[in-house]
Structure formats: structure tokens, C-alpha cells
Amino acid sequence: MIKSGVDIRGLTPQMAIAYTIACRCYGQYDCVITSASDGKHGPNSLHYKGQALDLRTRHLNGQGLQAVYLKLKESLGEQFDVVLESDHIHVEWDPKDKSISVEDR
């Protein structure tokens, strides 16, 4: 699901894959994108490059939230950063091997 008003134009294919995996990790809970290439983020945020999205967490309790977060982090692997923020889970495609970038493809 995508929150009303969220702009997903410009998301990279990697983020589409990440969202598909996130939906499986959320299981019985709704997996809602609350921010993508829209919104206000830090000046060097990967949101502006289409390489990050935020997922809603307000409907998850403590144990459920931790379970989803840990499963997502494990499932996405080391090419993605998964950060548990106070009101969302931030997911970004940030491969550590910088020899190949989106622009090179």
C-alpha cells in the first residue's frame, strides 16, 4: 500500500524488490510506504535518488515491530540499510561495493 500523496516516481528497481520483500516480512500487517522520493529528508538522502523509502510502523506493537525489523534486515541483506526510526522503518539501497552504481547500468 502507498499512503495518499506519496510520490513513488523515480524509485529504482531495487526499491521495488525491497518493497516486495518488505510486504512478506510484514506478514499479517499492512506494509505502507509513507515516504519515497517526496517529503523532507537530509540533504544527502538517498530518497532524492529514488533509492530509499519509509515504511509505517505505528500499527506494530513492540514485539511485532522488532520481528518485522529483524526479518527485513536479514532478508534484504548487506546491499540495503534498514534503520528502525522512532515512527517508521527506513530502507535504502546502499551497496557497500561502490564499483557499480545505478548510473553504470
For each feature predicted by the language model, list its residue ranges.
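Catalytic cores and adjacent binding grooves of peptidoglycan-active enzymes
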Residues: 5-9, 32, 40-45, 49-53, ...
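Extended, low-complexity, intrinsically disordered C-terminal regulatory tails
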Residues: 8-44
